[in-house]
């Protein structure tokens, strides 16, 4: 065989890959394809994360809006409106009857005690808690002292009220103001005479204190 023929044969063998070369090429192509797949998966993860993040943002916005709406409705519901309590009834009555006696009676004293308890929580105990707290927390001993302090004050107020009712059964002021509130209850619907909330009670008392100072 001539040298030219040998060269052509060698050249043709280079052009036509052997089965082993083909297998190696397929493996290489497959490897390159797999090496690119993490990039695609990373991109897919980014898209999935962005979608999930958008859903969370929309959910957070919805929750915040719902909470705000609920707070607004609660504020509107407890803002007073046509609902009344003994404080508002008695102050309106006194404004129209300057000769009315001093406040007294079951409705007056029960409302006064409820007011005192509410005021203690919102003002006195809150201030005492802030003085004792460390990182927004207090010990059980501190909590117990706060509760007993409030109990002591309310116990004395209840004893005074019970003593008055026991030893002054015919108090004319009690009869007067109890009758005023009974007449009021006779003219209001059951819906309007619902139990007054702490917020309404505190607001009514503050309003009365302001009017009294003026």
UniProtKB/Swiss-Prot annotation:
Biased composition annotated in UniProt, kind: Basic and acidic residues: 44-55
GO BP term, example: positive regulation of RNA splicing
Region annotated Disordered, chain positions: 1-87, 192-214
Ranges annotated as biased composition (Acidic residues): 192-201
GO cellular component: host cell nucleus
Stretches with biased composition (Polar residues): 56-71
Coiled-coil residues: none
Alphabetical UniProt keywords: Activator, Host nucleus, Transcription, Transcription regulation
Compartment(s) of residence: Host nucleus
Main subcellular location of this protein, as a coarse class: host cell
InterPro entries membership: Bocavirus_NP1 (IPR021075)
Basic residues composition bias: residue spans: 33-43
Pfam families: NP1-WLL
Keyword Transcription regulation: yes
Function description: Required for the expression of the capsid proteins. Performs the splicing and internal polyadenylation of the viral capsid-encoding mRNA precursor, which allows its maturation and expression. Transactivates the viral promoter.
UniProt family annotation: Belongs to the Bocaparvovirus Non-structural protein NP-1 family.
Name of the protein: Non-structural protein NP-1
Organism encoding this protein: Human bocavirus 2
Taxonomic lineage from the root: Viruses, Monodnaviria, Shotokuvirae, Cossaviricota, Quintoviricetes
Gene responsible for this protein: NP1
């Amino acid at each position: 065989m001539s040298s030219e023929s040998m060269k052509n044969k060698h050249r043709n063998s280079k052009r036509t890959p052997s089965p082993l070369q083909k297998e190696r090429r397929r493996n290489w192509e497959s490897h390159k394809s797999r090496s690119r797949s993490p990039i695609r998966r990373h991109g897919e993860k980014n898209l999935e994360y962005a979608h999930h993040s958008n859903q969370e943002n929309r959910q957070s916005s919805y929750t915040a809006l719902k909470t705000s709406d609920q707070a607004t409705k609660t504020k509107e519901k407890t803002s007073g409106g046509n609902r009344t309590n003994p404080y508002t009834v008695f102050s309106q009555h006194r404004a129209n009857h300057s000769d009315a006696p001093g406040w007294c009676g079951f409705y007056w004293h029960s409302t006064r005690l409820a007011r005192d308890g509410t005021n203690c929580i919102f003002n006195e105990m809150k201030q005492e808690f802030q003085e004792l707290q460390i990182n927004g927390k207090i010990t059980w001993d501190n909590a117990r002292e706060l509760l007993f302090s409030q109990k002591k004050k309310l116990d004395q107020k209840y004893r005074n009220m019970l003593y008055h009712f026991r030893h002054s059964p015919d108090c004319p002021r009690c009869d007067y103001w109890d009758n005023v509130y009974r007449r009021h209850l006779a003219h209001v619907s059951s819906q309007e005479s619902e139990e007054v909330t702490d917020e309404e009670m505190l607001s009514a008392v503050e309003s009365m204190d302001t009017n009294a100072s003026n």
